[in-house]
Amino acid sequence: MAWKIPAPDAVHWPAAPSWSGWWRALMLSCSAVVMAGCGIYFWLHDSRALVYAFAGVVVLILLFAGIAGWWMYRYGVLLEHADGTTQYNAMLEAQWQRWAQEGMVVSGVSTLFPEQVRTPQDSGEPVSTLAPLRLPECPGSTYLFTELLAPLRVALQIFIRNQSLTVCLPESASEDDWQCFWSVWAALSLPLSAIQLSEMKPEPFSRQMTLWQQKDAVRTGWLIIRHNWTPGSEGTQGAVAWLLSHPDIRTGLRPCATLHRVFPTDNTLPDGDLRQFLQYQCVSNTMKGVWSDAVTQPHISRLMVALSQQHKAVAEQGEATVIPPVSPVQQYLPHWLGEMKDGETWFAVTQVIQMAEHTRETQVLALAKGSEAFLMSVSSGGDNVA
């Protein structure tokens, strides 16, 4: 699973030259040559012995200087190569970090949940129940779309002034549902010419996010509507609407949050995945809240340990960083949304978006109870790189 990011090139730092042994060898060699020359001179009384001894010492010194120069040159080349490799690895890491922190800007969120579902803006404790929370019987698609679009009416009017908008209804939407959407859209005095229709395909959430982040999706915004409000639906019922756009689009709206690139993993949250997630999605290092479900909750402690190690490593490198004064607040999704089944991922991400917008702080979601397992950072505002 995880991101397919290539490993950095190996860096081989050369050992610094050690001259102590060579220096002793030079001194011993020179001393031996001088003593030999002096001995021959006193034995044979031949002054040429002193000349030869002096020449031998000079040759030894020049030989030592040549070897030392070659060693210093080789050491400098290897040191420069290691430093260049380090800088190249740092450049690649920065590029992958920018890639990992790309995301979609959330310009508006509308929700429809049972009264027991507490939003971050509400006071009081979460519901603390594992039972599914139910809505009254749905009066119809017209009521559903009206309740979701009415709070977003002003944001939609501003958004579609200069940008087109692609509307994505659930894959189960019928022709009658589309007709109801058209009628509600027109009733809110929104121009029909500004929107494009797109049926929401049954893609996993991470795959859907990847499709929205592709370059050909930059030309349009996205109105996403998902709900779990049918007679046969299981788990907590509700409905959500998101107004998404690519960071390159100027919408004229104040961003609520940024959904950063999804990190695919498995249910056990392997340590290697946690380290890679924190290393490349750097905005997660400033998290003030971490959300988990029944599957990932037992593994959150290892995420906290990995986060602490990441902060320690950055501090040892002497790099500037924003270290939270306290550990991130742990949020348990069933305490907010009850027992979830259908629409679990969309409802969970919606809660995290609302918390990031309310606290103006980064939140991290670890979700694995649904059809896929992933980690994702949700930062406040529209800054998609920490």
Name the predicted role of every residue range.
Residues 237:
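Phosphate-binding/switch region of NTP-binding enzymes
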